[in-house]
């Protein structure tokens, strides 16, 4: 493990209940791998859905955005900056994510132009 939750909070501004990445496992070049363990006690499950907890897809996308933000904002030249999620193309969800699951969050920066970063 490269960064735990305490380390991550020193890099990105997100806090409970909206901190959606637990660990950064590795950063190699333009690729980052993080993880999020899904617990039944998380706030989103109060309403999505009380009888059948399913992690909302938009929160999985946010977890990916936070993962890449840790990689980018941990660089010396980006310290003190904040990253904004501007859009997404072709998101697909292959199955439901439920309490007890562990999300592996893999992102790779493919292009950077005028301060905008493109990520797969």
For every predicted segment, state its role.
Residues 2, 68-106:
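Hydrophobic beta-strand-centered segment that forms part of the acyl-chain substrate-binding groove
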Residues 5-15:
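Short aromatic-glycine motifs in intrinsically disordered, low-complexity regions
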Residues 9, 51, 93-95:
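Beta-strand-rich interaction surfaces with strong enrichment in secreted/lumenal proteins
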Residues 15-55:
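Catalytic strand-loop segment that frames the active site of acyl-thioester-processing enzymes
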Residues 21, 88, 118-119:
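Hydrophobic residues on conserved beta-strands that form the core of alpha/beta folds
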Residues 23-26, 90, 95, 109-111:
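A residue-level detector for short acidic-glycine micro-motifs
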Residues 29-33, 97-101, 106-120:
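HotDog/MaoC-like acyl-thioester-processing domains
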Residues 47-56, 60-70, 85:
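Compact, glycine-rich, soluble single-domain proteins
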């Amino acid at each position: 493990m490269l960064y735990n939750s305490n380390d991550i909070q020193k890099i990105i501004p997100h806090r409970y209940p909206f901190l959606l990445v637990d660990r950064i496992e590795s950063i190699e070049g333009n690729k980052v791998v993080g993880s999020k363990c899904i617990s039944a006690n998380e706030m989103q499950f109060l309403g999505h859905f009380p009888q059948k907890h399913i992690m909302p897809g938009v929160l999985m996308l946010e977890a990916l955005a936070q993962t890449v933000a840790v990689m980018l904002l941990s660089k010396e030249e980006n310290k003190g900056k904040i990253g904004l999620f501007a859009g997404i193309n072709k998101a697909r969800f292959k199955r439901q994510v439920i309490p007890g699951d562990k999300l592996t969050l893999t992102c790779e920066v493919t292009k950077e132009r005028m301060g905008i970063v493109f990520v797969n």
